[in-house]
């Protein structure tokens, strides 16, 4: 079961960094979605391209308010919720190396023996610095494309959180006009912490859990794991940590240390309690020396695990 879960991470490798290498043969590349519309939000803004992981400034110590995760509406995906975007038809067309295709039917497993706790990337189109807790098409679409297929291996928990919005990130990176302030940067971290605490107290019941995120979500789970899991009793529950489009550091030549003090790098598909991390770039455009992710710093190097072949 755990081997299958780690192997299923290969599905994420097709597009969860910040630039896209050529896809390996025989992976799902064209989902075949049945006519099953996602929940609608009035007047959704036009879709925009994904952006790199934000390097968010140091947050104030206090959140502007706390979020109650006993309220089902504050979860994007959670077992038993209505209009769950992680429970849609995600049959896919497999394109093989010889060009032939095969329809891969998908079936979720509500009785999966482990859980997945996911924090999504920078996608919010809200016109303020911090997003609200009302999901829009952008949040629905990212969990459908990145996360939902793991529902065949784990129960999925994905909280809404007051993330640093895409508009705020663009303004910061371009030097353009700032977007209006709402809340504080500490709101995002407080939400992720509170969602994790509620999940542990009410849903975990001693089950193994995969903690995964992408981009801004990876920054949040890295902080969460370092503070709440690494070297703590809950580390025993960790099936794996999957940190995509961000950087986990280890001492050069080592498998443990650096970002996490006692959680090693995953080396085999059957290994548990370990971390998978990667950022993808075009094969002919490696990360520059000024890249915000994918590079080592000083005496450390960036973890770079191939999720489709953990043995190297």
Map each language-model feature to its residues.
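N-terminal module-boundary/linker segments of secreted carbohydrate-active enzymes
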Residues: 57-103
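Surface cap/lid and interfacial helix-loop subdomains adjacent to catalytic sites
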Residues: 186-205, 226-312
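C-terminal motif of bacterial Sec signal peptides marking the signal peptidase cleavage site
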Residues: 13-15
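Sec-dependent signal peptide recognition
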Residues: 2-7
């Amino acid at each position: 079961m755990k081997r299958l879960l780690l192997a299923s991470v290969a599905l994420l490798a097709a597009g969860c960094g910040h630039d896209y290498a050529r896809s390996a043969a025989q992976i799902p590349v064209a989902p075949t979605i049945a006519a099953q519309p996602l929940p609608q939000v009035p007047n959704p803004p036009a879709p925009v391209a994904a952006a790199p992981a934000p390097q968010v400034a140091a947050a104030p110590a206090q959140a502007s308010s706390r979020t109650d995760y006993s309220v089902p509406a504050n979860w994007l995906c959670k077992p038993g919720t209505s209009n769950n975007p992680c429970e849609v038809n995600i049959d896919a067309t497999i394109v093989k190396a010889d060009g032939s295709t095969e329809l891969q039917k998908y079936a979720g497993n509500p009785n999966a023996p482990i859980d997945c706790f996911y924090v999504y990337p920078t996608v919010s189109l809200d016109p303020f610095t911090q997003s609200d807790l009302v999901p829009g098409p952008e949040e629905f679409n990212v969990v459908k494309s990145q996360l939902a297929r793991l529902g065949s291996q784990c129960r999925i928990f994905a909280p809404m959180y007051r993330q640093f919005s895409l508009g705020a990130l663009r303004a910061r990176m371009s030097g353009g006009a700032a977007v209006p302030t709402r809340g504080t940067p500490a709101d995002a971290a407080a939400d992720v912490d509170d969602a994790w605490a509620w999940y542990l107290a009410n849903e975990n019941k001693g089950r193994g859990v995969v903690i995964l995120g992408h981009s801004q979500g990876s920054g949040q789970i890295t902080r969460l794991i370092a503070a709440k899991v690494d070297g703590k009793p809950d580390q025993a529950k960790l099936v794996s940590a999957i940190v995509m489009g961000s950087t986990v550091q280890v001492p050069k030549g080592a498998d443990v240390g650096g970002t996490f003090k006692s959680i090693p790098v995953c080396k085999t598909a059957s290994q548990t309690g370990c971390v998978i991390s990667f950022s993808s770039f075009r094969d002919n455009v490696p990360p520059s020396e000024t890249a915000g992710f994918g590079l080592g710093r000083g005496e450390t190097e960036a973890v770079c695990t191939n999720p489709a072949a953990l043995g190297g």
